Design a protein with these regions (language model features):
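Hydrophobic transmembrane alpha-helices of multi-pass small-molecule transport proteins
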Residues: 51, 131-150, 266, 275, ...
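Hydrophobic/small/kink-forming positions within alpha-helical transmembrane segments
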Residues: 18-21, 52, 81-86, 90, ...
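C-terminal transmembrane-helix exit sites in multi-pass transporters
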Residues: 50-58, 112-137, 270-290
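Helix-helix packing/entry segments at the starts of transmembrane helices
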Residues: 40-42, 102-111, 177-201, 238-277
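Transmembrane alpha-helical segments that form core, pore/gating elements
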Residues: 25, 51, 116-118, 122, ...
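Loop-to-transmembrane-helix transition segments
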Residues: 8-16, 63-92, 159-168, 217-244, ...
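Glycine-/small-residue-enriched transmembrane alpha-helix faces in small-molecule transporters
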Residues: 1-41, 154-181, 205, 310
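Specific transmembrane alpha-helical segments of multi-pass solute transporters/efflux pumps
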Residues: 19, 23-24, 52, 56-109, ...
Length: 310
């Protein structure tokens, strides 16, 4: 039992990364019918309704019961929602739009493990060991091999795209910092619920300005087959990517810390490559398998705990 509890944070974050690694496929499927902002609002609305239903039906003292936040903690939940998903999704979209190569955008957006130790050390006084740094570097090399090997377009495009990408990564890391600051008395479901509710309050007026009601009327104009695929993709994003994955990630951040949790972001391209191999038959060259191996080795090295010197 104790052994299972010890490995639960790692199993939890790997589950989150596995779900998020397939979310790109679901997003592309949903965007065939829905505009981006409409898709985001629909996704998070369904996620919040699901969490509300679970939270209200769960026994009062269970880990899935929805807890009422105190007034002094509300700013943390709101700040978390501003950082991610609100700012992150907007900056990520602009970075993909400004950079001519999706490959470069994906590589830049995968640098959160590199930035996380510096944010955690400065803002949380989190101890960073040589193993953390070494593991992150090894897994980042693996991530770059996965993303860049076989890519045909390395042009940058608008330099602002680089700034948007790094700003997006910074907001993602700051989100994990906020998660660490939220008092441990709140369970992960309550944390994710209030964070995403804060973001949805910001997304709705933005959606009204950009898409209006026309974004939702596209669902009525789609063919039955296309509608089924779109709703299935949105359901996956709502239940899987926005509820299960966020709760799993939140739990891990609060148990093992910002640096060690963010290191697992490097495994997402590896999972994506495996999804593409299994479902689309996309073959992986040997260099990408080396990249996957580097990511796994780097993650093991990063998780080595070294006590700070007294």
């Amino acid at each position: 039992m104790r052994s299972m509890k010890r490995f639960l944070p790692y199993l939890s974050v790997l589950t989150a990364m596995l779900i998020w690694s397939a979310s790109g496929i679901a997003i592309k499927e949903a965007l065939v019918v829905l505009p981006p902002m409409t898709m985001i609002v629909l996704r998070f609305s369904l996620a919040i309704l699901l969490m509300l239903l679970i939270g209200l039906c769960a026994p009062r003292n269970s880990m899935f019961a929805l807890q009422k936040p105190s007034k002094k903690d509300l700013p943390l939940f709101i700040l978390g929602g501003i950082f991610q998903p609100f700012l992150y999704y907007i900056l990520e979209t602009y970075s993909y739009d400004a950079l001519s190569s999706p490959t470069i955008a994906e590589a830049l957006l995968s640098t959160s493990p590199v930035l996380a130790p510096f944010f955690a050390a400065v803002l949380l006084r989190e101890h960073i060991s040589i193993f953390n740094i070494l593991g992150i570097l090894i897994s980042t090399v693996g991530m770059l091999l996965l993303v860049l090997v076989g890519a045909s377009d390395f042009s940058i495009g608008n330099p602002w795209g680089i700034a948007f990408a790094f700003a997006a990564v910074s907001t993602a890391v700051l989100y994990t910092i906020v998660l660490r600051r939220i008092p441990s008395r709140y369970n992960p479901l309550s944390v994710v619920f209030y964070v995403q509710l804060s973001a949805l309050v910001l997304f709705v007026p933005l959606c009204a300005c950009t898409d209006g009601i026309s974004g939702f009327t596209r669902l009525t104009q789609a063919s039955p087959d296309l509608l089924c695929h779109t709703l299935g993709a949105v359901a996956y994003l709502a239940v899987g990517a926005s509820v299960i994955a966020f709760i799993c990630f939140c739990y891990t951040v609060r148990v093992i810390g910002v640096t060690r949790t963010n290191a697992f972001n490097n495994v997402r391209p590896a999972f994506t490559a495996i999804w593409m191999l299994l479902f689309f038959g996309e073959q992986l060259p040997w260099a990408k398998w080396v990249g996957i191996l580097c990511i796994i080795i780097g993650l093991f090295v990063c998780q080595i705990v070294q006590s700070p010197k007294k």
